[in-house]
């Protein structure tokens, strides 16, 4: 491959201009993020006789991602998360232009999902509509660190279970990804709301007009996704001749 061809592949102009399935992929990312945000923040609403629990919210987000990955994975890969998309750009599994179009679709889907839940929920129940916020006493720097840590875990798991060079993975990749999201919520929801996904925070923030510390939920997850992608590519990506005989057999 020439240097010019390599650059074109990384940028990915042909992914947009020549790929006849690109619109299906973008619609899949829109719908996937729409349902992620709608179902996810729907679990956070507090009614007069019922308040959501941390466990309920954690498993709702994890299960909806696992389910959507099964539904849309064959179409777009079901990233439904800018941090995941950027992490895959770092490992050259997704081109820059395709990734940019994915992220726009994800953000629009997140806004639509939040808007539908707000419209379908009584005003006295809407509350903050699942807008993520930093816990009192936590600095924005600490918030960025927490979001980076839990997003690193998520994106690293995505790379690990979706590495098509591996021959030892026999379990459910979507379930593993969903459980990593559940684990992140169980550990960090009390710190930052456990976003792990810039689009998940962006949608409710836009609909509610509440942009307080929103940058934390872009910077933290994106940094975590980039580092996870780089670490996986440099040290853990399966290469020809690698020995996998000692891998866990799921």
From Swiss-Prot:
Subunit structure: Homotetramer.
Cytoplasmic compartment spans: 1-26, 78-99, 159-168, 232-250
Record-stated family: Belongs to the MIP/aquaporin (TC 1.A.8) family.
Motif (NPA 2): 197-199
Pfam families, sorted: MIP (PF00230)
Membrane disposition: Multi-pass membrane protein
Function: Forms a water-specific channel.
Main location: membrane
Gene Ontology, cellular component aspect: plasma membrane
Motif (NPA 1): 81-83
Keyword Transport: yes
Protein name as annotated: Aquaporin AQPAn.G
Highest taxon listed in the record's lineage: Eukaryota
GO molecular function: channel activity
Keywords per UniProt: Membrane, Repeat, Transmembrane, Transmembrane helix, Transport
Residues passing through the membrane, by range: 27-47, 57-77, 100-120, 138-158, 169-189, 211-231
Subcellular location field: Membrane
Extracellular side: 48-56, 121-137, 190-210
Domain notes: Aquaporins contain two tandem repeats each containing three membrane-spanning domains and a pore-forming loop with the signature motif Asn-Pro-Ala (NPA).
């Amino acid at each position: 491959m020439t240097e010019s061809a390599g650059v074109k592949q990384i940028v990915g102009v042909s992914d947009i201009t020549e790929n006849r399935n690109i619109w299906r992929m973008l619609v899949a990312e829109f719908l996937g993020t729409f349902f992620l945000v709608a179902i996810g923040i729907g679990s956070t609403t507090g009614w007069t006789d019922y308040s959501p629990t941390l466990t309920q919210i954690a498993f709702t987000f994890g299960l909806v991602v696992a389910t959507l990955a099964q539904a849309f994975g064959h179409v777009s890969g079901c990233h439904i998360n800018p941090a995941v998309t950027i992490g895959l750009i770092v490992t050259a599994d997704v081109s820059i232009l395709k990734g940019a179009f994915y992220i726009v679709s994800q953000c629009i889907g997140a806004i639509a999902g939040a808007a539908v839940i707000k419209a379908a929920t009584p005003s006295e129940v809407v509350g903050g509509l699942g807008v993520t916020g930093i816990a009192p006493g936590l600095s924005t720097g600490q918030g960025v660190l927490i979001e980076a840590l839990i997003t690193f875990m998520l994106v690293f798991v995505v790379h690990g279970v979706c590495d098509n060079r591996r021959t030892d993975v026999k379990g459910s990749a979507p379930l593993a990804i969903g459980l990593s999201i559940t684990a992140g919520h169980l550990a960090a929801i009390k710190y930052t709301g456990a976003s792990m996904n810039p689009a998940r925070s962006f949608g409710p923030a836009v609909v509610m007009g509440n942009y307080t510390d929103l940058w934390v939920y872009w910077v933290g997850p994106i940094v975590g996704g980039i580092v996870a992608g780089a670490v996986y590519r440099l040290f853990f990506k399966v290469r020809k001749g690698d020995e996998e005989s000692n891998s866990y057999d799921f």
